[in-house]
C-alpha cells in the first residue's frame, strides 16, 4: 500500500462501517421505542401495505360490532315496549271475560269499558312515543338496516311494525254492546223508522222503546231494507244499534257487529298473537346480532394477530440488534481513531 497523506483509505473504511452501525443502532432504537417493526414504508413496503389493509378491516369490523350492539339495544327497547302492550292486552282480555258474565249490570259494563278504553289509549301512547335514539320504533311499519360488516352490502335488517289499537283491530272494541243470538225472537215494541239518517230519527222516539231489545226496520242509504237490534240502557237512555238479519218468521238469523263485540275474546287472541309475532321476530334478530358480534370479534382477533406478526417488533431480535450495533459503534469509534493516526507514520519519513 502506498504511503500517502491526502487520502486516508483506512479512515474512510472505518467511517463507512461506523455509519452502518449507527444506522442499525438507530433502527433498533426506533423499533424498540415504538414497538413496531414497520415504522415507515422503507422498512417493508409490501408489509406496510398489507398491514394498512388489515388496519382498515379491523377498524371497520370493530365499528360493525358496535353497530350490532346498537341493533340489540334497539330491539330490546322495542321488545320492552311490546311487553307493556302485551300486559295491557292481557288485562283487557281479563276484563272482557269479566264483561261476558251475564250478572253484570249496565253500570258494571260501563266501568269495565272505561278501563279498557284507558288501556287502549295507553297502547296508542306506547306506539306513538316509544323512541330509540330519535327513531319511533312502533309508530309505523319500517325496515331499519344495520351495517354489520366492513364492506358494502354486509347488513342485517330489523323489521318493525306499527302497533296501536287500530292495527290490533281494537279501535272500536266495546264490551257494553249486547247483541241478539241467532234464532232469538225479538219483540217489535214501539215502531221506529230508521232510514239513512238513522240517528236523528231514532233519537226522537227513544222514550218509546220497550225495555231490552227491539227490532228496528227501515231503509239504508241505497234504499234497501235494513234491520237493526236496538238496545236501550234504562239508566242513561242510550240506545245501541246492531245490524241484524231477520227471517220471515221474525226470528233473528244473524246479528252483525264489530269483531270486538261479536267475538271479543277471539279479537284479543288475534291481537296477542300479532304482538307475540313481532316479539318473536325481535328476539330472533337479537340472537342473530349476538352471533354476528361473536363472529366479528373472532375475525378482529385473527386479523389483529396477523397484523401483529407483520408490523410489530420482536423485542428479543431488536434488543440483540441494538446490542450488536452498540458494540460495533464503540469498536468503530476506536478503530477510526487508530486509522486517523496512520498518516502520522508518513511524517516519520521526513525526519
Curated annotation (Swiss-Prot):
Localization annotation: Secreted; Bacterial flagellum
Key words, A-Z: Bacterial flagellum, Secreted
Homology family: Belongs to the bacterial flagellin family.
Organism: Serratia marcescens
Keyword Secreted annotated: yes
InterPro entries, A to Z: Flagellin (IPR001492), Flagellin_C (IPR046358), Flagellin_C_sub2 (IPR042187), Flagellin_N (IPR001029)
Ranges that cross the membrane: none
Main location: secreted
GO (cellular component) term, any one: extracellular region
Function: Flagellin is the subunit protein which polymerizes to form the filaments of bacterial flagella.
UniProt key word Secreted: yes
Record-given protein name: Flagellin
Listed GO MF terms: structural molecule activity
Amino acid at each position: 500500500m502506498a504511503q500517502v497523506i491526502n487520502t486516508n483509505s483506512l479512515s474512510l473504511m472505518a467511517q463507512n462501517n461506523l455509519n452502518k452501525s449507527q444506522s442499525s443502532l438507530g433502527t433498533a432504537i426506533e423499533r424498540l421505542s415504538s414497538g413496531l417493526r414497520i415504522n415507515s414504508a422503507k422498512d417493508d413496503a409490501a408489509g406496510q401495505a398489507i398491514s394498512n389493509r388489515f388496519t382498515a378491516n379491523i377498524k371497520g369490523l370493530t365499528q360493525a360490532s358496535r353497530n350490532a350492539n346498537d341493533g340489540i339495544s334497539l330491539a330490546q327497547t322495542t321488545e320492552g315496549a311490546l311487553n307493556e302492550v302485551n300486559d295491557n292486552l292481557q288485562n283487557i282480555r281479563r276484563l272482557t271475560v269479566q264483561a261476558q258474565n251475564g250478572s253484570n249490570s249496565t253500570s258494571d259494563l260501563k266501568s269495565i269499558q272505561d278501563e279498557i278504553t284507558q288501556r287502549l289509549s295507553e297502547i296508542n301512547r306506547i306506539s306513538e312515543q316509544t323512541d330509540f335514539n330519535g327513531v319511533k320504533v312502533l309508530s309505523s311499519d319500517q325496515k331499519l338496516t344495520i351495517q354489520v360488516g366492513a364492506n358494502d352490502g354486509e347488513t342485517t335488517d330489523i323489521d318493525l311494525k306499527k302497533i296501536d289499537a287500530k292495527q290490533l283491530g281494537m279501535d272500536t272494541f266495546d264490551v257494553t254492546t249486547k247483541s241478539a243470538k241467532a234464532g232469538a225472537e225479538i219483540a217489535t215494541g214501539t215502531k221506529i223508522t230508521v232510514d239513512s239518517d238513522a240517528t236523528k230519527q231514532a233519537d226522537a222516539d227513544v222514550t218509546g222503546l220497550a225495555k231490552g231489545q227491539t227490532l228496528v226496520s227501515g231503509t239504508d242509504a241505497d234504499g234497501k231494507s235494513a234491520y237493526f237490534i236496538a238496545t236501550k240502557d234504562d239508566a242513561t237512555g242510550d240506545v245501541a244499534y246492531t245490524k241484524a238479519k231477520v227471517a220471515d218468521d221474525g226470528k233473528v238469523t244473524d246479528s252483525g257487529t264489530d269483531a270486538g263485540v261479536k267475538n271479543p275474546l277471539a279479537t284479543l287472541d288475534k291481537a296477542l298473537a300479532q304482538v307475540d309475532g313481532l316479539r318473536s321476530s325481535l328476539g330472533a334478530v337479537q340472537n342473530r346480532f349476538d352471533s354476528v358480534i361473536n363472529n366479528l370479534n373472532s375475525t378482529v382477533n385473527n386479523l389483529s394477530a396477523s397484523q401483529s406478526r407483520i408490523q410489530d417488533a420482536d423485542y428479543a431480535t431488536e434488543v440483540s440488534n441494538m446490542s450488536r450495533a452498540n458494540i460495533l459503534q464503540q469498536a468503530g469509534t476506536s478503530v477510526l481513531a487508530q486509522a486517523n493516526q496512520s498518516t502520522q507514520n508518513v511524517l516519520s519519513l521526513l525526519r
